[in-house]
């Protein structure tokens, strides 16, 4: 399993109506709980009713310096690029990728 940086939020899934994140750090756990996320196994999840609610929740996660998981297809990094291309999200965000389980790279887009 990949090492997650201390005191971070890693967004693992944002394609459907449920957002799935992994959170390290008690302060951030409290903040995302306030946003409505609940524990589900090793993740925290939150369901949204529509695309507008999802975009607003993504904005809140970006304010908390969340890292969007890099990958191809409908990984969070690609979904964010799609939202930017369509004008649904403006602004910067960060993606995280791993070259090996304990070595990660963070990039701002």
What are these model-derived regions, one by one?
Residues 1-109:
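Accessory DNA-engaging acidic/polar modules
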């Amino acid at each position: 399993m990949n090492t997650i940086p201390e005191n971070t939020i890693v967004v693992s899934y944002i394609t459907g109506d449920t957002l799935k994140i992994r959170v390290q750090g008690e302060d951030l756990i409290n903040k995302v709980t306030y946003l409505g996320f609940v524990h589900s196994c090793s993740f925290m999840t939150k369901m949204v009713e529509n695309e507008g609610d999802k975009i607003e929740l993504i904005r809140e996660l970006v304010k908390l310096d969340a890292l969007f998981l890099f990958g191809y297809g409908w990984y969070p990094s690609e979904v964010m690029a799609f939202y930017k291309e369509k004008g649904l999200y403006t602004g910067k965000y960060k993606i995280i990728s791993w070259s090996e389980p304990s070595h990660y790279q963070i990039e701002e887009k």
